Amino acid sequence: MLTIYNTLSKAKETFKPLDGNKVRMYVCGMTVYDYCHLGHGRSMVAFDLVTRWLRKSGYDLTYVRNITDIDDKIINRANENGETFDALTARMIDAMHEDERRLNILPPDQEPRATDHIAGMHAMIQTLIDKGYAYAPGNGDVYYRVGKFVGYGKLSRKKIEDLRIGARIEVDEAKQDPLDFVLWKGVKPGEPSWESPWGPGRPGWHIECSVMSTCCLGESFDIHGGGSDLEFPHHENEIAQSEAATGKQYANAWMHCGMIRINGEKMSKSLNNFFTIRDVLEKYHPEVVRYLLVASHYRSAINYSEDSLRDAKGALERFYHALRGLPRVAAKGGEAFVERFSMAMNDDFGTPEACAVLFDLVREINRLRDSDLEAAAGLAGRLRELGDVLGVLQLEADDFLRAGAEGKVDAAEVEGLIQARLQARTDKNWAESDRIRDQLTAMGVVLEDSKGATTWRLAD
C-alpha cells in the first residue's frame, strides 16, 4: 500500500485516488527564459520517478506539467537578447526537451503553456471578482484579496498576522492590503499583452497554474508537486485562488522535492556555483547524473560535488559489472528482492532503501554467475527491471563502462591487443602477456579477466 508525505498535513498518508484507479497529477514546470539548471533537473527526475512507480503499481496516471512562457524574467531576457519573447521561449523549450531526453525523463501526458490559457485566466479572475475575492482598482491590475480567504497559510503554516509584521513590504497604493497579490498585470510599454475585461495586460504567475491545472485535470485532483521553494508563496496562492473560485479542495496531496546544494552551499548565481544540466552533462554521463538525483530521497536536499558524482558513477559501475557478460533474458527469480524494493518505494518513494536492494541483488548475481549462469541471467533481468523504475540500467553494460572512450582510444586497437594477450596467455608467454597489459594500462585501459573472457573499460 502506497503512502505519500503530504505537505498539507505534514504527515505520511495512505494514498487513495479520488476516482478509483485513476490518478491525476500536476507539477509546476519550468519558466523558460534560460537553460534548465540542476534544480530543475532534480524536480523533473523526482516526478519522473513518481510517474514510473505509479504506473508500475498499476495506476492509470495522467501527468500534467506546465510551461510558464510569459513572465518578467522572460520579458527581460528577450529584451536583453533583442528577440521576441516567443522566439526565446521556443528555443528554451526545445533545449529543455533535449535535457529531459538525455536524462531519460518520460514526457508528461500534457504540457500546457500559459499563453494558451489566457481566456481561462480571464474566466477565473472574473469569478474571483464576482465572489469578492479579487478587485480591480482601476489601474489595469487585478489583485487577490488575501484576507478574505479563511484558509490562507494552511499549506505553509504561515499566519497572515505574522506575514504582515515580519515581511518587508513595498508600498503599493493600489492594494487594499499589502499582502494582496496580483492576478492580472496592466500593460507596460514594450511588454507583450493580451486584451482583457480590465484592459490590456498579462497574467500573474500564480493564476497561471490554477487555471492550467484545473483545465487539464478538473477542479479537484490527486497530487500537486513542485520544488520546496514553491511551497510559499506560489502554492499557497494557488490554493487560495482555486478553492475560492471553485468552493472545492484543490489538490488532495502536495509533494515537494528538496533543493540542490553545491559543495554544501545553496546553489545560486550570486555564489557563482550555478550549473545548468548541459554544463554537467559535458563532464558526466547522463545516467551518472540521473542516479545522483534518484539515489537520495526526493524530499531531501542533494549535495552536488565531484565526490558525490564519483560515488554515483561507482555505484552504476558495480551494477553494470554485474550485468556484463550475462545474456539478456526475462527477469526470473529474486522475488524477495522485488518485495523489498516495492516496500521501499511504497514508503513515500524511498529510493535510498530501493537502491540498497539493488546492491544486494548485485551481490547475489555475482555469487551465482560462475556456478549457475541461468539463475544469474534471470536475476540480471530482474536488476534491469527494477532499475527501470529508477530510470537506469537499460544500456548495454559495455556501452556504459566504455562511455567516453571515443576520441581517447581506438577500440579496434584495444580489442586487437586483448586478443594478442589472450594468445600469449594460451602460449604461456607470460612476459608478452604482461607487456601487453602494461601497454593497455598506459593507454588508460583497465582489463577485467573473468571465466573465459576479458573485458575492458577506461580508467577513471
Curated annotation (Swiss-Prot):
Positions annotated to bind ATP: K269
Renumbered ranges of motif 'HIGH' region: 30-40
A GO term for molecular function: zinc ion binding
Record key words, sorted: Aminoacyl-tRNA synthetase, ATP-binding, Cytoplasm, Ligase, Metal-binding, Nucleotide-binding, Protein biosynthesis, Zinc
Binding-site residues, Zn(2+): C28, C209, H234, E238
Compartments, record wording: Cytoplasm
Alphabetical list of SUPFAM superfamilies matching this protein: Anticodon-binding domain of a subclass of class I aminoacyl-tRNA synthetases, Nucleotidylyl transferase
GO cellular component: cytosol
Predominant place of localization: cytoplasm
Subunit structure: Monomer.
NCBIfam families: cysS
Record protein name field: Cysteine--tRNA ligase
Organism: Pseudomonas putida (strain GB-1)
